[in-house]
Amino acid sequence: MDHKNSQSASYAAAGVDIVAGYRAVELMKKHVARTRNDGCLDDVGGFGGCFGLPVAGMEQPVLVSGTDGCGTKVKLAILMDKHDTIGIDAVAMCVNDIICVGAKPLFFLDYIACGKNIPEKIAEIVGGVAEGCVQSGAALIGGETAEHPGLMPAEDYDLAGFAVGIVDKKKIINKDRMSEGDVVIALASTGIHSNGFSLCRKVFGIDNNNPELYIPQDSLGGKTIAETLLTPTKIYVKSVLALLEKVDVKGISHITGGGFYENIPRSIPDGLCAKIDKAAVKVLPIFDLIASWGNVPERDMFNTYNMGVGMSIVVPADQVETALDILKANGEDAYVIGSIIKNDEEKVILE
């Protein structure tokens, strides 16, 4: 059987534009340059990103890694044709995870899969990644943009990445040091962050590009549902690092998919439980809107969304005021939402 094609084939004819890839790299270089720090040993473009480890003063340096994406939040970015903040979400989801063990982010790498490489769009996305890196103190030392013609529609893309941080072994946050009477502090979120978008898409008709997405809502301070949902995930790294210098932090939870019920227990040891005062939680208006439009039960809301709390931190009762002062001085809306009690059956109770 003759498999030869009468027409000559090329990578471009197959849908992969190498020249566009080169242009995208050139356009993103200015964004990457913003993230350079003392650990960077080379420029973007090599086969591997080299980074010198800042281990001075550490007895047992430990590397901590985390990887994540933005979920289906990218669907809304695509619909709105707004791509300059979704990269912040990708970074936030990773660095907020590794700070939960006390690790200072060192560097970040991103991965973009797209149906068609449009250099200007890719540069916008990477610009957001760079902004997230600046906010967290991480260097953007590399990445990959993969063009997938035939696998993804031309306008679609997905974004993910991973972060690597460092912490001295003796300073790794150890939940086993937690005790009855410790206090749970909330750090306010900027909104839905990057989780629960599949439910949002159903409730608000995002996949059908519901016109109501673009109507200003009084309950959202005059903003539209679309722009409120696309608000970038808050990055807590620098605030938490400042806290760790002065306060005995015993546990941190990044409130992501699964909400309070799945994330708070991850930082609570056996035999103890975080008792959360629901009335103390400053629920953001967007969550009330999701609940009312979708008729979503309260339990499901707290089991899906952050509800206005992007991170919870456990500290000793006698250090609460110091912790709040430090966090507020670093721009956080921080407040007490609960305490640690003895309980052999549950690790979080909301009442």
Model-derived features: where do they sit?
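Glycine-/charge-enriched secondary-structure boundary and capping motifs
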Residues: 2-13, 121-139, 152-159, 210-214, ...
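Residue-level signature of catalytic and energy-coupling elements of molecular machines
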Residues: 17, 68, 181, 254, ...
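Buried hydrophobic packing segments
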Residues: 24, 28, 50, 94-95, ...
